[in-house]
Amino acid sequence: MDEEHKLNFLDNCYDDDFCTGEHFTVLRALARDADPYIRAEAAAAAVNFTHPDTKALLLLLTRDEEELVRAEAYDSLSVFPCDEVAQCLTNAMEEEWEPLARSYAILSWADVTVGLCRDLSAAAETVRDMQRQPCGEHVRLTLWYALCRLGQEDALTQIAGFLCSRDYHIRCAAVAFLDALSDEARRPMAEKSIREALAQETAKSVLSAIETHFPGAM
């Protein structure tokens, strides 16, 4: 299969009717492709398969040598709330050396922890311990995402503070998080923060993110 056919196959994986056992066999082969981009796309597409081996494939990809592949695998594992996945993500939060991959591990860990109905107060303390350690801005942002998922009241306000980051990638992520995490009661605060950020925002990608997530603010 040449690269064009591989990419077409991976695009088709986002069609529910396409995600059969036969096609999972092809996906599993692409997850071992020599091209890390293909492996990463396979990890991202795997989330759409209900095949019993999907989880095992993603756990394997969390050990890939390429950061992007690991990041996509961590991201896709968010839909598997089970002890094995929770332990994998916990290990990644502590041991993952690349910030992008570590951030995705934190995001999925929070979702899996909530899905498992674990002791959220103990989980929140784990996150606060991580906040006391040196880490980059993207990891700090995702730690606040985790705390918000775990029920910490002021976490959404802390996330809004990242709208002032000098890094537009961080600002884009903050916009998406504010949308995802703001329920009906907290939506007005999120929208107010977005409108304030709009007064000084010039980056097209951030403006596009705001238009997507908060169309009423534009």
Positions of the model-derived regions?
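Structural signature of alpha-helical solenoid repeat scaffolds
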Residues: 11-14, 47, 78, 110, ...
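Alpha-helix N-cap/helix-start positions at coil->helix boundaries
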Residues: 3, 21, 36-37, 67-68, ...
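Long, ordered, amphipathic alpha-helical scaffolds
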Residues: 148, 168, 172-218
